[in-house]
Amino acid sequence: MEVNTYLNAIILVLVVTIIAVISTSLVRTEPCVIKITGESITVLACKLDAETIKAIADLKPLSVERLSFH
């Protein structure tokens, strides 16, 4: 009887491991992209917490007048 319980425990661990591997491989995460052009700022697939929102709010589109080339 102990061998049967041991085998059941091993099978349970294997099934749980396989389910975990499959579920994590199905979840795809997109990289956070912040695109700044001369006309707009676009935020794609970013996790927006208070700090990120504050940082994005301070951004401005690029303009040649504000760029300096030294």
Curated annotation (Swiss-Prot):
Which family is this sequence assigned to?
A: Belongs to the Tymovirales TGBp3 protein family.
Q: Which organism is it from?
A: Potato virus X (strain X3) (PVX)
The subcellular localization recorded is: Host endoplasmic reticulum membrane
Q: Which UniProt keywords apply?
A: Host endoplasmic reticulum, Host membrane, Membrane, Transmembrane, Transmembrane helix, Transport, Viral movement protein
Other comments on record: TGBp1, TGBp2 and TGBp3 seem to act together for cell-to-cell propagation. TGBp1 is the main movement protein that physically cross the plasmodesma with the viral genome. TGBp2 and TGBp3 would facilitate TGBp1 function.
Classify the main location: host cell
Task: Tell me the Gene Ontology biological-process terms attached to this UniProt entry.
Answer: transport of virus in host, cell to cell
Q: Where, by residue number, does the polypeptide cross the bilayer?
A: 5-27
Q: What does this protein do?
A: Plays a role in viral cell-to-cell propagation, by facilitating genome transport to neighboring plant cells through plasmosdesmata. May induce the formation of granular vesicles derived from the endoplasmic reticulum, which align on actin filaments.
Cytoplasmic topology: which positions?
Answer: 28-70
Cellular component aspect of the GO annotation: host cell endoplasmic reticulum membrane; membrane
Q: Which Pfam families does the annotation name?
A: TGBp3
**Protein name, please?**
Movement protein TGBp3
